[in-house]
Structure formats: C-alpha cells, structure tokens
Amino acid sequence: MIEVSKVTKHFDEVQALAEVNLDIATGEFISIVGPSGCGKSTLLRIIADLVSTDGTVKKPNKGAFVFQDSALLPWRTVQGNVELLMELEGTDNKKSKASVALKQVGLNGFENSYPHQLSGGMKMRLSLARSLVLEPEYILLDEPLSAVDELTREVLQEELYEMWTRDKFTAILVTHNIAEAVYLSNRVVVMSPRPGMITDIVDIPFEKRTPEIRADDKFNQVVNYIAG
C-alpha cells in the first residue's frame, strides 16, 4: 500500500501542492489528471523521494520510475540498457532476465540495437522493460506515452495494461489524456489548478479492458464526466 498524507510543496514563493492525501491499495492502478502546472508530476516525484515535502509518504521499498523521455543511455545497446539496473544491484543471471523482459515487451531480436535506432514506441517499451526487470512492487509513470502518435499510444496502453495484469505491481500514472487514464485505471484522481489539491476520485466501473471498450457509451460518459 502507498499512503500519501498531508503532502504540501512550495518552490520558493510558489505553492505547488496543498494538503494532498491519497491511499493506494497494493496492486491498484491509479491515474492522476488535472490542468498543466497543477503539481501532478511534482506529486509523483515526491512519492519517488526525488523531491522533498512537508507531508509524509509511506510505500514499499522496491519501486521504479518511468520518465516521459525514456531516459535511455545512448551508448548502451537495448540489452545493455535493460541490464544496467541489475548491474548496479549485483543481480545474477542478468542476460537471461533481460532477454525475458525484452520478450515480454516485444523487443526480442533488437538486443544489439541502440536507442537511436528505435522508434518512439520501441524506446518506451525498452524503458518499461528496464523498470520491470527488477520486479518492482510499484511503478511510477510520468506521462510515458505522450511523445508517440495516437495509434501507437493506444497499442502501448494495451501492452501496459497487460503487463500490469500479469505482474500485479501497483501503478501510478500521470497523464493529460483522460481516455488513457480511464482505460488503464481502477481509479482516476482529479487535481485542481495550482496549488494542486485532489478535487475528485473517480472509480472506473470496468472489470476488463479491451480495445473495443473505447467505443462504449459508458466509457465515453466516464471520460466526459472527468473532463467536466
């Protein structure tokens, strides 16, 4: 479980977040939406211990962060990028574990390629493989699909959903795309303009997600409700 309690953040004279409280159950997929500058990414970085806060965050020890720009090392191959964190942790069987992770995200056969040779969607798959290879208890995702075209984005949403249902990690996604949030999440957290506060938490009433659900009237009703 992840517990966010009374999280407040100032950057000099600017208040980014005000008294944010949020409990996220183990294995839950949560998305955070809201206007630009409302503190969504700041909240994610606070949960990751990348930014300090006046409040408290309780979470499992083993987590991963997927950045918007994929944060790949250009001088390392696809295989080398996936093996990096395992090298830092002294993990055994790096090669075989990396191969499994790459197969899970559809990048088997590209082990010896370099990041500059990959499409935007492939780079994001690689970033996800690098995060999943250590079997984290939770994953924080900061707009990871924002740089790809819409068709690729929908395919990656489906793949991310499959990874989550398979590996049972807790996920927190920051996104500007409300349909994406509804497709992936158990609940969608809606934040106010700065200083960011939670104004609504919407339960998503769908058990399973398939591409066809995007055309469902109820799906679009939920999207429109969150959009206001």
Task: Kindly label every feature range from the protein language model.
Residues 33-35:
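The feature captures the beta-strand-to-loop junction immediately N-terminal to the Walker
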Residues 48:
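Helix-to-loop junction immediately C-terminal to a conserved catalytic motif
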Residues 79, 111-114:
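Signature (C-motif/LSGGQ) region and adjacent switch/coupling loops
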Residues 79-87, 95, 203:
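Short helical segment in ABC ATPase nucleotide-binding domains corresponding to the A-loop/adjacent helical element
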Residues 92-110, 162:
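Conserved ABC ATPase "signature" region
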Residues 113-116, 134:
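Conserved signature/switch motifs of ABC ATPase nucleotide-binding domains
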Residues 128:
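Hydrophobic anchor residue at the start of the ABC signature
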